[in-house]
Amino acid sequence: FILVDSLTNNTVAAGMILGGEAAPPYTESQRPPALARVHTQVSADERSERLGQKGCTVWLTGLPAAGKSAIAFALERRLFDLKRFAMVVDPDDGLSKGVQPDGSSPWQTPELARRVTDAGLIIIFAYASPLRADREAIRDAVGSERFVEIHVNTALEARRSRDARGVYSPGHVPPGEEPPHEPDAIVSLDEHDAEEVAYELVKVLEKRGLLPSTYAL
């Protein structure tokens, strides 16, 4: 290296770095103690008692324009009116950025579902999620006892009438799906509106023991 005088531009020194010995590794006595992970001091039972509900993930799956979002927000409204605590994750909000070309959920979705469920809230997803493996990843993350799978199986003509994105326009490849083997419920907007479906889904949550039965009255 060289050192240059900034006023005269004259070289005033030069040298070479030959290297040095690497610092010795920590011995066991010198190694700093690992920080212990801090865990929540609020148990799931305490949250359930305070909120009057058990945290869970409600997953609405179905083809595009089947009415998943309408049902999700109607269910959120119904639960709110019953003094329950719920939130919706919808394809049009910022949390949904990163949906894969095959319709798979963003990579962070299982962790989001688990954390909100652990907090004792009811989180309602309105993703198409056509792949069965994608939905099973969410089930594995939150646990089967806290995962409620709803198949929104609205008929093609009704989906076409609701289609705002041109998914069913001529020339488009019809979307496909791997329907659930054993969903907690199969619903549609063929003969019922979203509010009526939401009422039935509250009963599903009761049956699963996630809500007290009196709240559907």
Model regions: which residues?
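C-terminal effector modules of nucleic-acid-centric enzymes and ribosome-associated factors
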Residues: 1-54
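Hydrophobic, well-ordered secondary-structure elements that form the walls
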Residues: 9, 124, 159
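Hydrophobic anchor at the beta1->P-loop junction of P-loop NTPases
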Residues: 58-60
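P-loop (Walker A) phosphate-binding loop of NTP-binding proteins
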Residues: 63
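Conserved substrate/cofactor phosphate-moiety recognition/catalytic segment
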Residues: 66-118
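Glycine-rich phosphate-binding loop used to anchor ATP phosphates in small-molecule kinases
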Residues: 97-156, 168-170
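Small-molecule kinase domains that catalyze NTP-dependent phosphoryl transfer to phosphate-bearing small molecules
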Residues: 153-217
